[in-house]
């Protein structure tokens, strides 16, 4: 009997069962009651001090943080005078993600509902110039000036009223809960998914919510022996800083006795390199529409990084992962570098041979443009099922590969349409000044290329487009466990005070936005966000448990999710 294969089958079965038991609507089935009970909102006496330490700005609290946004909108909903502004806010967001065919009708309805003085929901706080532009305008971004005006209005008096409300106190309760330590015991490990230079990646489940994650475990001794502290901290800080549906998110960072752990978005569909070569070995590569869809999502992920002064430096098919629905995210930011304030370029050899731009190979200073060269290589490989500088399966020394990148003109097989060939050529320009890429703070120059003529960028970025391929939910897109291999024990490494301090700094706990999203999507937020119908202070704020409350209190509560 092949016990290695048996181990893989058993591990895969357990993991697939866990995947099947969880979705956003039926989370309770996969929750651990013991740990769920520990997710309990504290009395106000425990969290009032947070007023002094939290950033209480309108944008950060009410627009960026999911629970903050929900509570602010719930507050507005309970105050009739703020109803028109709230509804206009939501309707503009709905318009921005609507199908093109529906937008004219929605625009007309929006103008009639909020911009006409006789309308029931007339927004009298809007100035005449903003209203006139919204009435006369057309096309993308039509109502963005209007949305900015609405949010500017809500960020003044309504926001100050929110800060004096029970809804803000509820926000403090959630921030207290968010800050509580959640370490190794909160997570159940399933099978190993892969192995890197410093440790392994496991599929895991957050016990209290049932949500599945990937846990990257960096062995402490191996990190110290191979001088990996700086790289690990850079990756962790960058992951914590970025939040995009096109980049894996960091939800938790903690330490165990042996490892530093990064709990991140799990991508069950495997990497696109696997799909290029292994799914249909007789016909490797993607049809162009599929390659274009993935490229568009990668462009949005790169733009998010570059707007935050982060150069990725390791874009390649292995680092682009598919989720359950078939959308892709950029992963593995271990080689990324963040430019300092005022810095426009950096130096340093980093990346994968065949994907590194000429200026990087020559040891010159470089900027975000190196990532768009790598994007060109990645798109080429998606379509051609080979790299632009070597044939499939060809063994090429790095020195020879470097010369090809610097000097060789790229040839294109017949699989490339004129648009995809032109786009690749624009990305694979040897001269970074001529290369298509990030300009003036955005990737609009790429978005307007004919390659993306069928892509609705608004809907893509809202996650509303249907992917061209959906991974099989019954398949684990990972190597067999015995093929992943195992690390040998690291000997002769002792930790000192400086090591312990580094580990403690690394283990920063929960990341606010992903954690709040988890609470909402798994139903925990709705379960705990209980209010009295008479508008008085809920029992949990007073520190009164459900058992201590009056017998009739259960029927006298309402839940707002």
Curated annotation (Swiss-Prot):
Regulation: Inhibited by RCVRN, which prevents the interaction between GRK1 and RHO. Inhibition is calcium-dependent.
Pfam (any one): RGS
The AGC-kinase C-terminal domain, residue ranges: 453-518
Domain of life where this protein originates: Eukaryota
Modified-residue entries (Phosphoserine), positions: 5, 21, 488
Gene that encodes it: GRK1
Protein name in the entry: Rhodopsin kinase GRK1
Modified residues (Cysteine methyl ester): 558
Organ and tissue specificity: Rod outer segments of retina photoreceptor cells (at protein level). Retina.
GO biological process, one term: signal transduction
Lipid sites, type S-farnesyl cysteine: 558
Organism this protein belongs to: Bos taurus
Positions of post-translational Phosphothreonine modification: 8, 489
UniProt function note: Retina-specific kinase involved in the signal turnoff via phosphorylation of rhodopsin (RHO), the G protein- coupled receptor that initiates the phototransduction cascade. This rapid desensitization is essential for scotopic vision and permits rapid adaptation to changes in illumination. May play a role in the maintenance of the outer nuclear layer in the retina.
InterPro entries found in the cross-reference section: AGC-kinase_C, GPCR_kinase, GRK1_dom, Kinase-like_dom_sf, Prot_kinase_dom, Protein_kinase_ATP_BS, RGS, RGS_sf
Subcellular location: Membrane; Cell projection, Cilium, Photoreceptor outer segment
């Amino acid at each position: 009997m092949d016990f290695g294969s048996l181990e893989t089958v058993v591990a895969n079965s357990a993991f697939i069962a866990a995947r099947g038991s969880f979705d956003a609507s039926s989370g309770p089935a996969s929750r651990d009651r013991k740990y769920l009970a520990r997710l309990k909102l504290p009395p106000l006496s425990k969290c009032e001090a947070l007023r002094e330490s939290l950033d209480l700005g309108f944008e950060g609290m009410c627009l960026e943080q999911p629970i903050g946004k929900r509570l602010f909108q719930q507050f507005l909903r309970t105050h009739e005078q703020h109803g028109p502004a709230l509804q206009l806010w939501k309707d503009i967001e709905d318009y921005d993600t609507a199908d093109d065919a529906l937008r004219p009708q929605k625009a007309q309805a929006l103008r009639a509902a909020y911009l006409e003085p006789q309308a029931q929901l007339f927004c009298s706080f809007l100035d005449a110039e903003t209203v006139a532009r919204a009435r006369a305008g057309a096309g993308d971004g039509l109502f963005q000036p209007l949305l900015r005006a609405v949010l500017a209005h809500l960020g003044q008096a309504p926001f100050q009223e929110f800060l004096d409300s029970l809804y803000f106190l509820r926000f403090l309760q959630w921030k207290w809960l968010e800050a509580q330590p959640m370490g190794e015991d909160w997570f159940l490990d399933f099978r190993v998914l892969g192995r890197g230079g410093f440790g392994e990646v496991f599929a895991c489940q957050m016990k209290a919510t049932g949500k599945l994650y990937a846990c990257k475990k960096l062995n402490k001794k191996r990190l110290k022996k191979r001088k990996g502290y700086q790289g690990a901290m850079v990756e962790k800080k960058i992951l914590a800083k970025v939040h995009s549906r096109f980049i894996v998110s960091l939800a938790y960072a903690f330490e165990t006795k042996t490892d530093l752990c990064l709990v991140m978005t799990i991508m069950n569909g495997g990497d696109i390199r696997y799909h290029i070569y292994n799914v249909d070995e007789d016909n490797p590569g993607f049809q162009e529409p599929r390659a274009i869809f993935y490229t568009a999502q990668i462009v949005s992920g790169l733009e998010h990084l570059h707007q935050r002064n982060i150069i990725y430096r390791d874009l390649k098919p292995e680092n682009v992962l598919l989720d359950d629905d078939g959308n892709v995210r950029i992963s593995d930011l271990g080689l990324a570098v963040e430019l300092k304030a005022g810095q426009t370029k950096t130096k340093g050899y980093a990346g994968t041979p065949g994907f590194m731009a000429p200026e990087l190979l020559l040891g010159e200073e470089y900027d975000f443009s190196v990532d768009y060269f790598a994007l060109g290589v990645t798109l080429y490989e998606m379509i051609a099922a080979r790299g632009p500088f070597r044939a499939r399966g060809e063994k090429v020394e790095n020195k020879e590969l470097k010369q090809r990148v610097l000097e060789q003109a790229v040839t294109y097989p017949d699989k490339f349409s004129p648009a995809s060939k032109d786009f690749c050529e624009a990305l694979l320009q040897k001269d970074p000044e001529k290369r298509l890429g990030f300009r003036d703070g955005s990737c609009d120059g790429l978005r307007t290329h004919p390659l993306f003529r069928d892509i609705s960028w608004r809907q893509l970025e809202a996650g509303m487009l249907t992917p061209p391929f959906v991974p099989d939910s019954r398949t684990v897109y990972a190597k067999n466990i015995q093929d992943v291999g195992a690390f040998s024990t690291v000997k002769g490494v002792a930790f000192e005070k400086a090591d312990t301090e580094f580990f403690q700094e690394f283990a920063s706990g929960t990341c606010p936005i992903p954690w709040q999203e988890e609470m909402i999507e798994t139903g925990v937020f709705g379960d705990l966000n209980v209010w009295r119908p008479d508008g008085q202070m809920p029992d949990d704020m007073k520190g009164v448990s459900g058992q201590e409350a009056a017998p009739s209190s259960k029927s006298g509560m309402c839940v707002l999710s």
